[in-house]
Amino acid sequence: LNVQKILMISITPYNYIIFAILIFFHKKINGFVILRSDGFKEYGAKFGFFGEKIYEILYKKILKKLKPIVVTNKISNLKDYDYHKISPSEITDEWKKNFKKPNLKKANLLYIGRIRKEKGVYSLLKLITDFSIKYKLSIVGQKKKNFFIDKNIKFYNETSSIKKIISFYDSNNIFILPSYTEGYPKVILESLSRLRPVIVFNEISHVKKNLKGIFISQRNANDLQKTIGYILKNYSKIQSQIRKNKILSRKKFQNDLIKLIK
């Protein structure tokens, strides 16, 4: 019987169903599963204790057959498995052209991503209502009518247009990633590629790695305001540091992945 080789992109109930069907028909399966974030924490944030247990079942069954490819070793229960580590990137030459000078008169904050509990967006919205500084927050994701009414907060529909995404970074001066759990978020590389500093909270401090231009804040309004103030005051110096980053390209990432799964 032929061995069915597969590459699974993340562990989800839907992917597990396809996985189970393949096992039923092919019996012998091997390959890889890419883990971009800590599913245990994500399912726990969304569904509580039972969410973690459901994910644990899927995790153990899939990793019996597939070898994990991870973007960070900060994944729960990973120590029990042999794994490969890669650094994903979507950065092309387009990201490194026509830089725009930021407006620093006030904090123009940006978040790009899903509007979900585990992404920390609701937490961020609560924090900024206590701000004493002038700010504007742009959220690019699923647009929801009457989601949050505030003159300083604007919602935009998600987009796959690189040109539009770049314009969002260029029209703001700080990117905030408020997630409770992350692996290797591509938005960090995008923001740094456009010379825009990034703020994350202490729960995902590991994403900083050796990258310059990433700042870690406690999850409270006072510390976040202090971090924003420091960035705006030292913006030119921070941009000079960001330029020293060696950001992996999408081409390099794709070549590394192809070599790994061959």
Residue ranges and their predicted role:
Residues 107, 111-130, 139:
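A conserved mid-protein helix/loop that constitutes part of the nucleotide-sugar donor-binding site
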Residues 167-172:
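Short alpha-helical donor nucleotide-sugar binding micro-motif in glycosyltransferases
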Residues 202, 213-222, 230-235:
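Conserved acidic donor-binding segment of nucleotide-sugar-dependent glycosyltransferases
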Residues 42, 53-97:
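A short, active-site helix/loop in glycosyltransferases that binds the activated sugar's phosphate group
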Residues 146-160:
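Nucleotide-activated donor-binding/catalytic signature segment of Leloir-type glycosyltransferases, i.e.
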Residues 236-262:
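A charged, aromatic-enriched C-terminal amphipathic alpha-helix characteristic of glycosyltransferases
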Residues 180:
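Aromatic "clamp/platform" in nucleotide-sugar-dependent glycosyltransferases that forms part
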